[in-house]
UniProtKB/Swiss-Prot annotation:
DNA-binding recorded as keyword: yes
Gene this protein is translated from: pcn
S-adenosyl-L-methionine is among the record's keywords: no
Transmembrane segments: none
Pfam families listed in its UniProt record: PCNA_C, PCNA_N
Protein name as it appears in the record: DNA polymerase sliding clamp
NCBIfam families: pcna, PRK01115.1-2, PRK01115.1-4
Length: 249
């Protein structure tokens, strides 16, 4: 099924793919008349990734029918990283088994990536009984994860009324990042009960890599439960991570 899809701002799209490529080696993207979607798990099955990009966020979206295309994420990332912020990204597929990627700026550069067979995972995004929901600025969570990585390989999230804390403890060091609604970095918090859970820093680092400074990130978690991290792409697109907890001894 041929298609042509145009996205203004190649660098932004590249950052999105780079974030996912840190966790998965290959992906099956479903291309329909409504938009592009992808759901995958990392090889260790610790993180579930759910991506949804509606047709409305693209400047041109010509798709007739439905097709699933499999790609090597590292190859796709390397090509897209060649794009600049003001360049236009064009994705095309004809009758051949290739994805054609064009970067249009002062010149038009075109790459062809071979499509591969990727097994689609049949897993739903579960509805979990989260007891805490936090909306935070992207820069805050990115810096907190960097700080935590200096002292430990896991970070604890703690939410209670009007207060959200991220804490990491090593053998001799510890770091704590605390926010209340008086701080600019914490935009909203809803807590049913005091909630605590720990998560692996290596996974968190990959998940927050593509966040912009002013991006709003929604974090939902429960006591020793998976954490759902969600952020929007141009208001309507959405990237969700579901990360298994680090069970503490």
């Amino acid at each position: 099924m041929p298609f042509e899809i145009v996205f203004e701002g190649a660098k932004e799209f590249a950052q999105l793919i780079e974030t996912a490529s840190r966790l998965i080696d290959e992906a099956a993207f479903k291309v329909t008349e409504e938009g592009i979607s992808m759901r995958a798990m990392d090889p260790s099955r610790v993180v579930l990734i759910d991506l949804n990009l509606p047709a409305s966020i693209f400047s041109k979206y010509e798709v007739d029918g439905e097709e699933t295309i499999g790609v090597n994420m590292d190859h796709l990332k390397k090509v897209l990283k060649r794009g600049k912020a003001k360049e236009t990204l064009i994705l095309r597929k004809g009758e051949e088994n290739f994805l054609e990627i064009s970067l249009q700026g002062t010149a038009t550069r075109t790459f062809k990536l071979p499509l591969i067979d990727v097994e689609e995972i049949e897993v739903d995004l579960p509805e979990l009984p989260f007891t805490a929901k936090v909306v935070i600025l992207g820069d805050v969570i990115k810096e907190a994860v960097k700080d935590a990585s200096l002292v430990s390989d896991s970070m604890k999230f703690i939410a209670k009324e009007n207060e959200f804390t991220m804490r990491a403890e090593g053998e001799t060091q510890e770091v704590e990042v605390k926010l209340t609604l008086e701080d600019e970095g914490l935009l909203d918090i809803e807590v049913q009960e005091e909630t605590k859970s720990a998560y692996g820093i290596s996974y968190l680092s990959d998940m927050v890599k593509g966040l912009g400074k002013a991006d709003e990130v929604t974090i939902k978690f429960g006591n020793e439960m998976p954490m759902q991290m969600e952020y929007y792409i141009r208001d309507e697109g959405r990237l969700i991570f579901l990360l298994a907890p680090r069970v503490e001894e």
